[in-house]
A protein has these predicted regions:
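N-terminal anchoring/stem segment of glycosyltransferases
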Residues: 1-49
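Residue-identity detector for glutamine
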Residues: 28, 54-57, 75
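General N-terminal targeting signals
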Residues: 23-25, 53, 97-98, 104
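GT-A fold catalytic core of metal-dependent nucleotide-sugar glycosyltransferases
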Residues: 62-108
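Arginine residue identity/basic-tract feature
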Residues: 16, 48-50, 60, 69, ...
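An acidic/histidine-cluster motif and surrounding catalytic segment
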Residues: 35, 46-63, 94
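Aromatic-acidic/polar surface patches that form glycan- and anion
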Residues: 13-20, 58-66, 109
Length: 109
């Protein structure tokens, strides 16, 4: 079973825009019993490998998150969400599987 943990990355210490704040509120609303964990340079070692270190120094936060998200899920389990993902219902139905991957599709296509 996948643990009730939602992980997200916020490297760079910039203030979160309103969209990100609203998306995180949707996670709290639809998954109130989940632990929501923000990963950043204070609680994640961005010097784990040369790729991440170079990306961090270049302020390429998305590249830092690309590696960190996989490492975090591998180590702690749970669900990783990008900060622009808005939930419209609980994620509980996904927890009984061994794993899954999601992707976005433009609804206009």
């Amino acid at each position: 079973m996948i643990p009730k943990k939602i992980h997200y990355c916020w490297f760079g210490e910039n203030e979160k825009p309103l969209l990100v704040i609203e998306c995180i509120k949707s996670w709290q609303k639809y998954c109130p019993d989940y632990e929501i964990m923000e990963w950043n340079s204070k609680n994640y070692d961005v010097h784990k490998n040369k790729y991440m270190e170079q990306a961090y120094q270049a302020k390429r936060w998305g590249f830092v998150s690309d590696y960190a998200r996989l490492d975090i899920i591998y180590q702690y389990g749970g669900i990783y969400l990008d900060t622009d993902v808005e939930l419209i219902r609980s994620l509980d139905d996904l927890l009984e599987t061994d794993g899954y991957i999601g992707f976005e599709k433009n609804v206009d296509e």
